[in-house]
Amino acid sequence: MDTMIDIKGLSIDELERFLLGKGKERYRARQIFKWLYQRGATSFAEMTDLAKELRRDLEETARISTLSPEALEISRDGTRKYLFRLDDGCSVESVLIPEEDRNTLCISSQVGCAMACEFCLTGTFRLTRNLTTAEIVNQVCAVQRDVPVRNIVFMGMGEPLANLDNVIRALQIMLHDDGLQFSTRRITVSTAGLVPEMERLGRSVTVNLAVSLNATTDELRDRIMPINRKYPLAVLLDACRRFPLPGRRKITIEYVLLGGVNDTLDDAKRLVRLLSDIPSKINLIPFNEHEGCSFRSPSQDAIDRFHRYLLDKHFTVITRSSRGADISAACGQLKGKLDALKPSGAGKQIEVSDSTNEVT
């Protein structure tokens, strides 16, 4: 059994305590963080401003994990889907969405998902396990070696707030000045609506929050999102009102438009009433059809009508284009399996590594 500490699984405070336990100076933690996250060091030998004695000690008691993509698929629209094989054979996917002025990376927090949302392909796979802090952070590090990343969204495989300890620790690494140096404005954590964990997230770190709402009545949300039976709309929306928002930031409300299910004008009217006193902006996401799911994409008329009504009521609203759908990288299509990356005429597949164990 591997008893060595994965150094990339530690927050700066935990790394300081680890070093203090060895009789070393606290400031060494900041030096190590910079080597890991700003210089991309993969061995302690590279950390030349550390004393040789400390480097030898670290080599004997700690390790630096890495991830390399086992496969990469590139969409016609430039979206890049990375498949990472973890050290226990499990796999997860991350998606890079390119824009003119920024790249947004969508990362995973779990292998599979227990939320069982009816419209989400990931939800059809049972939850296998939580990702470790290092596995979350290493998705960002791996993609940054390939292309620059400006924004991070926790909207990949899994429910981030169901893995809150590791997600918070990963966020602390991403936000730290000696870590990955992301701005709090550039990171968004999405949730299906785990209310107690929303409150703890708000107390622990300052990041943007996205709530996957998708219905305007408890009857419908109970059916398509089972978590609603535990935390119904009134409870969830009250938690949104209490969530600490710095400055003039708003909660992002994600609303997947399901054809003939939740895309009517009456749905739009109820949504406006529900959000009337919550600082929010709305992302409309036309459903991406996938095999084995009975839901259908909404008509363009229904999308336009819904969008216009929200605009007329002075909401900030964006209808998201379906990026990466030709390589099953669009919202709700991630499944973390090699069979998701079979070559097709639509996307280009690039095999990056034949290894089945990418964590070292």
From Swiss-Prot:
Chief site of localization: cytoplasm
Molecular function terms, GO-annotated: 4 iron, 4 sulfur cluster binding; metal ion binding; rRNA (adenine(2503)-C2-)-methyltransferase activity; rRNA binding; tRNA (adenine(37)-C2)-methyltransferase activity; tRNA binding
Annotated binding of [4Fe-4S] cluster, by residue: C113, C117, C120
GO CC, any one term: cytoplasm
Binding site for S-adenosyl-L-methionine: G158, E159, S190, S212, L213, N214, N288
GO biological process per UniProt: rRNA base methylation; tRNA methylation
Top EC class, one word: transferase
The record's free-text note on cofactor binding: Binds 1 [4Fe-4S] cluster. The cluster is coordinated with 3 cysteines and an exchangeable S-adenosyl-L-methionine.
Keywords: 4Fe-4S, Cytoplasm, Disulfide bond, Iron, Iron-sulfur, Metal-binding, Methyltransferase, rRNA processing, S-adenosyl-L-methionine, Transferase, tRNA processing
Pfam families: Radical_SAM, RlmN_N
Active-site residues per Swiss-Prot or TrEMBL entry: E93, C331
InterPro entries for the chain: Aldolase_TIM, Methyltransferase_A, RlmN_N, RNA_MTrfase_RlmN, rRNA_lsu_MTrfase_RlmN/Cfr, rSAM
CDD domains for this protein: Radical_SAM
UniProt-listed SUPFAM superfamilies: Radical SAM enzymes
Ranges of residues in domain Radical SAM core: 99-326
EC numbers, comma separated: 2.1.1.192
Compartments, record wording: Cytoplasm
Reactions it catalyzes: adenosine(2503) in 23S rRNA + 2 reduced [2Fe-2S]-[ferredoxin] + 2 S-adenosyl-L-methionine = 2-methyladenosine(2503) in 23S rRNA + 5'-deoxyadenosine + L-methionine + 2 oxidized [2Fe-2S]-[ferredoxin] + S-adenosyl-L-homocysteine; adenosine(37) in tRNA + 2 reduced [2Fe-2S]-[ferredoxin] + 2 S-adenosyl-L-methionine = 2-methyladenosine(37) in tRNA + 5'-deoxyadenosine + L-methionine + 2 oxidized [2Fe-2S]-[ferredoxin] + S-adenosyl-L-homocysteine
Cross-referenced Gene3D superfamilies: 1.10.150.530, Aldolase class I
Function, in words: Specifically methylates position 2 of adenine 2503 in 23S rRNA and position 2 of adenine 37 in tRNAs. m2A2503 modification seems to play a crucial role in the proofreading step occurring at the peptidyl transferase center and thus would serve to optimize ribosomal fidelity.
Further remarks about this protein from its record: Reaction proceeds by a ping-pong mechanism involving intermediate methylation of a conserved cysteine residue.
Family named by the database record: Belongs to the radical SAM superfamily. RlmN family.
PANTHER family named among the record's database cross-references: 23S RRNA METHYLTRANSFERASE, RADICAL SAM CORE DOMAIN-CONTAINING PROTEIN
Protein name: Dual-specificity RNA methyltransferase RlmN
Source organism of the structure: Geobacter sulfurreducens (strain ATCC 51573 / DSM 12127 / PCA)
